[in-house]
């Protein structure tokens, strides 16, 4: 790995470590998403506690955390496999943020943002898959899992040279969802839009 790729990997992790959900909730004077609802600082949980506007802002910011470093690396001529490493670094920053006590989200939106530079057709297929599963079953986590399982196949169909890095990224997302998988099997996973909240954790 050359110096440019190492630098972009570090930048990607640090950018990913900026928790959009926590900062936006602070600005809007909403509860800390790490202590209410699903305790996950992501767009779905912010939707539960703050509504569509706040959730959309979180979604956009989380996607940009993946898009900016990967797109920058692409234009700097970094090879596809190393772009995958940069994407993983951005997602790891989102999942284990340096600036927020390593309490982060699941990385789905950041991963989508990282994949977006590959092409709008691939991005559209991924988003359509997520929306279809989410509408049919009302589980954000299930939609994410189905989408990441299909994403490498979509990538192979469109730009096969990026299949390996996308597959690496998707494996990380699946591992991060291990608790959601357990709750889906036990029937305890909250559905999209549910308003039932837990009391904030004591600081």
UniProtKB/Swiss-Prot annotation:
The record's Pfam families line, in alphabetical order, gives: G3P_acyltransf
Where it sits in the cell: the answer is: Cell inner membrane
Q: Name one GO biological process term.
A: phospholipid biosynthetic process
**Function field:** Catalyzes the transfer of an acyl group from acyl-phosphate (acyl-PO(4)) to glycerol-3-phosphate (G3P) to form lysophosphatidic acid (LPA). This enzyme utilizes acyl-phosphate as fatty acyl donor, but not acyl-CoA or acyl-ACP.
Question: What organism is recorded for this protein?
Answer: Vibrio vulnificus (strain CMCP6)
Q: Which UniProt keywords apply?
A: Cell inner membrane, Cell membrane, Lipid biosynthesis, Lipid metabolism, Membrane, Phospholipid biosynthesis, Phospholipid metabolism, Transferase, Transmembrane, Transmembrane helix
Family as reported in the entry's similarity comment: Belongs to the PlsY family.
GO CC, sorted alphabetically, is: plasma membrane
Traced from the root, the source organism's taxonomic lineage reads: Bacteria, Pseudomonadati, Pseudomonadota, Gammaproteobacteria, Vibrionales
Q: What is catalyzed by this enzyme?
A: an acyl phosphate + sn-glycerol 3-phosphate = a 1-acyl-sn-glycero-3-phosphate + phosphate
Membrane topology annotation:
Multi-pass membrane protein
Per the UniProt entry, the Enzyme Commission number(s) are 2.3.1.275
Q: GO molecular function terms here?
A: acyl-phosphate glycerol-3-phosphate acyltransferase activity
Enzyme class per UniProt: transferase
Could you tell me which pathway this protein works in?
Lipid metabolism; phospholipid metabolism
The molecule here is called Glycerol-3-phosphate acyltransferase
Q: What is the first-listed, main subcellular location in coarse terms?
A: membrane
Q: InterPro entries, alphabetically?
A: G3P_acylTferase_PlsY
Q: Which residues cross the membrane?
A: 4-24, 80-100, 117-137, 139-159
Q: How is this protein organized at the quaternary level?
A: Probably interacts with PlsX.
């Amino acid at each position: 790995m050359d110096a440019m790729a190492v630098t972009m990997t570090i930048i990607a992790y640090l950018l990913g470590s900026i928790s959009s959900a926590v900062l936006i909730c602070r600005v809007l004077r909403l509860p800390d998403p790490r202590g209410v609802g699903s305790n996950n600082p992501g767009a779905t949980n912010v939707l539960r506690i703050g509504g569509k506007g706040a959730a959309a802002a979180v979604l956009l910011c989380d996607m940009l955390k993946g898009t900016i470093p990967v797109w920058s690396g692409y234009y700097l001529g970094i090879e596809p496999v190393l772009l995958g490493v940069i994407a993983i670094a951005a997602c790891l920053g989102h999942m284990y943020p340096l600036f927020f006590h390593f309490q982060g989200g699941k990385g789905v939106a950041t991963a989508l943002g990282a994949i977006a530079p590959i092409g709008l057709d691939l991005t559209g297929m991924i988003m359509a898959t997520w929306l279809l599963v989410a509408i049919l079953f009302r589980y954000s986590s299930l939609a994410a899992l189905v989408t990441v399982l299909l994403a490498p196949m979509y990538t192979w169909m469109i730009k096969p040279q990026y299949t390996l890095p996308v597959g690496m990224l998707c494996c990380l997302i699946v591992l991060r969802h291990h608790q959601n998988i357990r709750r889906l099997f036990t029937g305890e996973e909250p559905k999209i839009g549910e308003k039932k909240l837990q009391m904030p954790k004591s600081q």
